[in-house]
Design a protein with these regions (language model features):
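Alpha-helical linker/hinge and terminal dimerization helices associated
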Residues: 65, 94-106
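Basic, amphipathic "hinge/linker" alpha-helix immediately C-terminal to the N-terminal HTH DNA-binding motif
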Residues: 74-97
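Short loop/turn motifs at secondary-structure junctions and domain boundaries
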Residues: 7, 73-74
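Basic amphipathic alpha-helical segments that dock to polyanions
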Residues: 55, 59-62
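A short, conserved structural fragment
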Residues: 63-71
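Recognition helices and adjacent regulatory flanks at domain boundaries
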Residues: 1-9, 46
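N-terminal amphipathic/basic helix or basic patch
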Residues: 8-11, 93
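N-terminal helix-turn-helix DNA-binding core of bacterial DNA-binding proteins
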Residues: 11-54, 75, 81
Length: 109
């Protein structure tokens, strides 16, 4: 897990956005929250426009921050599954509110 001791945050929102900010992290977390365990390829198909490099980076960061769990199965072909950790599950109400806000305001675009 990343060490945030050296970094001082002005407020808790800044810390939260450090962990889940950006274009892809909230969407990855949303799909894992709604669909449960997903394999890498399944996540990639859900995120139209994301590159392999970006998805790999985002998954590694979410895992390092303790928000998702990566389960690797040593078999042929290799199998890796991603799921929310207990800490990651605490973000579900926030993601649900973001979804609700988006549904209410998307039609105005």
């Amino acid at each position: 897990m990343k060490s945030f001791i050296a970094k001082q945050y002005a407020c808790p929102v800044e810390y939260t956005l450090t962990l889940i900010g950006g274009k892809w992290k909230p969407v990855i977390l949303w799909h894992l929250a709604n669909d449960g365990i997903k394999r890498y390829g399944e996540i990639k198909k859900l995120l139209i426009g994301i590159t392999h490099k970006m998805l790999s980076q985002q998954l590694k960061e979410l895992e390092a921050d303790g928000l998702i769990h990566r389960e690797e199965y040593h078999q042929i072909p290799p199998k890796v599954e991603y799921s929310l950790t207990d800490k990651g599950k605490t973000l579900i109400p926030i993601l649900q509110l973001m979804c609700q806000w988006g549904q209410e305001n998307m039609e105005h675009i």
